[in-house]
C-alpha cells in the first residue's frame, strides 16, 4: 500500500480575476521523485470554464498503478469529494491538489470529474478528464554479474555491477563449481559502479555459477539477474 499524504488542496478563484475562461482539463503540474519517500510528490490541476453555470464543481480521484498491475483508485482523505464555487463574475474554476510520500516503484494519475449546475441546483452538464502520469521509478540497488573471465591458470574474475539508482550495502559474491563454493564479501557498491572480484579456479569439464548476493542481504529492484553460469576453461 502506498504511503501517501495529502498536503495541499488550493482552490484558485476570486482575488485575482481570470482574464479568460480556462480550458476544460486535468493536468500534471509537477512530478518529483527521489530515493526518500519525503522527496516524492505530485501536483495535479483541474480547470473548467463557467459556460453560464451558477455553480461549478470538480472532484479529484487519485489512481495508482503498481508494477505489473492496472490503475486502481486510492482512497485518501480529502480526495474523492466535490469542491465547488458559486462565485459570480469569474469565467471559470481552477483547483489544485498535491499529494506527497508517493510509493515507488509506481505510477500515479488524477481522474478529475466536472459538474455544472444551474441556480436551482440542477446538474446541466458533466465531464471527466484524466491527467498525464507521474511515474516514480524503483530507487533500490540492482546487483548483477556482468561478466566472468578466466586467467591462464583457470582462476575466475567476475565483474559485479550495480545497475540500480542507490548504493547497496554489504553483500557476498559466490562461485559454485561442482561441490566447491568460494565466497567473497564486498562492503557495498555505489549506484552505477562496477567492481572486479577475484574468485577460485575451475577447469573443464564442468561449469561455474557466479552469484551476486546469494544470501539476499540486499533488497533489489530485480532479483532475477544475479547469477551467471559459464563453462570452465580447458587446462592448457
Show which residues each predicted segment covers:
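Conserved aromatic beta-strand anchor motif in extracellular beta-sandwich/beta-rich domains
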Residues: 58-66, 175-179
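Surface-exposed loop/edge segments in extracytoplasmic proteins
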Residues: 67-78, 179-185
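Contiguous beta-strand segments within globular domains
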Residues: 34-47, 53, 152-157
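Short coil-to-beta strand junction motifs in C2/discoidin
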Residues: 54-60, 168-173
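Bacterial N-terminal signal peptides
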Residues: 3-13
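Extracellular/luminal regions of secreted and cell-surface proteins that mediate adhesion/ECM remodeling
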Residues: 21, 26-35, 85-86, 103-107, ...
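Extracellular acidic, Ser/Thr/Pro-rich low-complexity tracts
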Residues: 48-53, 162-166
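A beta-strand/beta-hairpin structural motif
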Residues: 78-81, 87-98
